[in-house]
């Protein structure tokens, strides 16, 4: 007869059983952040850095959208224009449209991000109320040239849009 105890290790310490269940999760030890990670987080907690970064990214998005939508435009060209003249005319229109979109999206990103960061720091909370307030500030300031009624409509519209986008992305994360 074969001895069954010979197959077992003789370390003296009994090891805990390993869970073979796929649903069980392994507990990971807590890892403290490094100095570089702490400094990087401190940089991103600065409202000016957030606002400028959002402004630059918004400007880039506006530039790309302006180029794309400018290319889709069907400008009124005269039959007397040569192909080269039509190309130059279309390129100028695309450039002008993309530059205008770039400026608009840059200001929008900068104002929204700065307002949200300032409200978040003042309230010491990260929730949807910050998004609504920042959306109101952004929408109101972007449409303020149209008068107080336009500013109120812009405030309500952009705040609603911002909250809906926030809820949509929170649901999918």
From Swiss-Prot:
The chain crosses the membrane at residues 52-72, 101-119, 128-144, 151-168. Expressed in young cotyledons, roots, flowers and leaves. Coiled coil: none annotated. It comes from Arabidopsis thaliana (Mouse-ear cress). Essential core component of the TIM22 complex, a complex that mediates the import and insertion of multi-pass transmembrane proteins into the mitochondrial inner membrane. The keyword Methyltransferase does not apply. Belongs to the Tim17/Tim22/Tim23 family. The keyword Mitochondrion applies. One of its GO terms (cellular component) is TIM22 mitochondrial import inner membrane insertion complex. It is a multi-pass membrane protein. InterPro entries: TIM22 (IPR039175). Residues 1-18 form a transit peptide. PANTHER family: MITOCHONDRIAL IMPORT INNER MEMBRANE TRANSLOCASE SUBUNIT TIM22. It holds the Pfam family Tim17. Disruption phenotype: Embryo lethality. It comes from the Eukaryota. It is found in: Mitochondrion inner membrane. Induction: Up-regulated after antimycin A or rotenone treatments. Signal peptide: none annotated. This is Mitochondrial import inner membrane translocase subunit TIM22-1. One of its GO terms (biological process) is embryo development ending in seed dormancy.
